[in-house]
């Protein structure tokens, strides 16, 4: 009889414990602290150029290679916080259909395909990653650009620019509104284009070729995206 009572007590205790456990984890307030901040967010990353289109050049460094490396690092940071990340490319290739002849035609088709991929996705945000280059060597500094179609474009660009200034400590640039960029004009999702530095500036080109600096840039972009999704109110200028 004593054995039976002991068994019943154990069983009752187990049932109570199971009920409490189930209640604790089904309660929304209790579960919130365990949720990753970007859970359920779908983000499209667009590393510029690729394949026959090398983009800007700085010594032996090609824009297409740096944009891909930075994008991979941004992807990893975002995924760690629960985001679903899609990339327009994950290798050294363009997106022009097979058989497309001629450099200019391939480039035009590549851009159309990037727009199509992003627009046909369920992404809540896109980030296009590029590098700058101009004839003068004196200009430097990462900068985010946005198209004025959506208010959200300006918001995410400003958050990312604030993080670039804060973390890289080598630019005072501000997020800038821009026109005439095919991808930005035709994408129907909020987003921004980030020029992560100038390959035409020898000192900055050297930095952009280093994995440690690439990671610093990627971390800044990631932190800006995180703030865009989690902070309320107006972003800093």
UniProtKB/Swiss-Prot annotation:
Signal sequence, start to end: 1-27
Protein keywords: Cell wall biogenesis/degradation, Hydrolase, Secreted, Signal
Subcellular location: Secreted
Main localization of the protein described in the UniProt heading: secreted
Catalytic activity: Hydrolyzes the link between N-acetylmuramoyl residues and L-amino acid residues in certain cell-wall glycopeptides
A Pfam family reported for this protein in Swiss-Prot or TrEMBL: Amidase_3
Domain MurNAc-LAA residues, every copy: 43-226
Enzyme Commission number(s) of this protein: 3.5.1.28
GO molecular function annotation: N-acetylmuramoyl-L-alanine amidase activity
CDD domains on file: MurNAc-LAA
Family from the record: Belongs to the N-acetylmuramoyl-L-alanine amidase 3 family.
Other observations noted: CwlD and PdaA are necessary and sufficient for muramic delta-lactam production in B.subtilis spore peptidoglycan.
Protein name: Germination-specific N-acetylmuramoyl-L-alanine amidase
Encoding gene (name): cwlD
